[in-house]
């Protein structure tokens, strides 16, 4: 059996993690198994399902330069105790170089960097991320990307021109999102939204998802449509700030913050919407 060690932050319901689970559920797990390397200690929403399917979850120190000696020591122990690992795939953006360098030092032959974004977030970690990005080429030997722009961002124009990367689409289970009027009516009834014009958004509360602009837009929509109602699915560090913003805009009673819910519930709620809005930012 082939075991692939995926480096992520933790296995919560976020875009990259959900994409991995979509693939994990459909591969032949008698031939290939996924294990997960998490640099956050908190439990993830998918942990129980991963263990039920035969996967392992390892926790490491955080991804920052001060903790790297401890991180490297932890990784060495994992590889020594699991000599079957021949493939490591990093999904952490530029910080994925931590896992890839540890894999290289421990002689793991296949080291994949999987690009998921077309830009690098400009926050206080930016200088560290730029150094990590510069170190990626010497530590990875396989290029995966969800799209051309993400490949261009992390691998450079020459790699894209040579087509020297694997394009891995973010597959979804489309049948789960087929419209069902019965589900639509039930969701609306349960949430007292039978006669509302629902606008929906699914996304983690983080800067890239641009909830600030979304709420500004909906505030204007609500002035023109007295029946408009915004439903936000997801969780994240900016959720409380967005609740405060909705209150300040005077639309608190017209916005429902659902929080983090199971994927099945998400697909049902999406079916209850009339419109969806996704004002993402490239940071």
Where do the language-model regions lie?
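Glycosyltransferase donor-sugar binding loop
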Residues: 36-44, 172, 202, 206, ...
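Nucleotide-activated donor-binding/catalytic signature segment of Leloir-type glycosyltransferases, i.e.
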Residues: 243-261, 270, 277
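N-terminal strand-loop element at the rim of the active site
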Residues: 2, 6-70, 164-165, 237-238
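Membrane-proximal helix-turn-helix segments that form the acceptor-binding/catalytic region
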Residues: 105, 126-143, 163, 271
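A conserved mid-protein helix/loop that constitutes part of the nucleotide-sugar donor-binding site
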Residues: 14-22, 197, 201-220, 230, ...
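A short, active-site helix/loop in glycosyltransferases that binds the activated sugar's phosphate group
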Residues: 140-178
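A short helix/loop element that forms part of the nucleotide-sugar donor recognition site in Leloir-type
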Residues: 75, 178-193
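Short His-centered aromatic/hydrophobic patch
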Residues: 90-96, 115
């Amino acid at each position: 059996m082939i075991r692939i060690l995926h480096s992520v932050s933790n296995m919560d319901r976020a875009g990259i993690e959900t994409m991995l689970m979509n693939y994990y559920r459909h591969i032949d797990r008698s031939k290939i198994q996924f294990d997960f390397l998490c640099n956050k200690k908190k439990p993830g929403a998918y942990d129980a399902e991963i263990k039920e399917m035969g996967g392992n979850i390892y926790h490491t120190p955080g991804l920052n330069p001060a903790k790297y000696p401890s991180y490297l020591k932890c990784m060495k122990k994992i590889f020594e105790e699991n000599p079957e690992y021949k493939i490591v795939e990093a999904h952490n953006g530029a910080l994925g170089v931590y896992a890839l360098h540890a894999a290289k030092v421990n002689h793991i032959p296949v080291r994949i960097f999987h690009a998921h974004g077309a830009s690098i977030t400009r926050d206080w970690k930016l200088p560290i991320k730029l150094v990590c990005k510069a170190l990626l080429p010497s530590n990875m030997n396989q290029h995966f990307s969800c799209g051309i722009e993400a490949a261009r961002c992390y691998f450079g124009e020459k790699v894209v021109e040579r087509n020297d990367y694997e394009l891995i689409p973010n597959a979804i289970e489309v049948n789960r999102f087929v419209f069902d009027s019965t589900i639509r009516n039930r969701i609306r009834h349960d949430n007292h939204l039978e006669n509302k014009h629902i606008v929906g958004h699914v996304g983690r509360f983080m800067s890239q998802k641009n909830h600030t602009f979304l709420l500004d837009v909906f505030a204007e929509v609500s002035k023109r449509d007295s029946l408009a109602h915004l439903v936000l699915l997801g969780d994240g560090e900016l959720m409380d700030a967005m609740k405060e913003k909705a209150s300040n805009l005077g639309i608190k009673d017209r916005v429902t913050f659902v929080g983090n819910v199971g994927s099945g519930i998400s697909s049902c709620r999406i079916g209850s919407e009339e419109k969806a809005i996704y004002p993402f930012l490239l940071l």
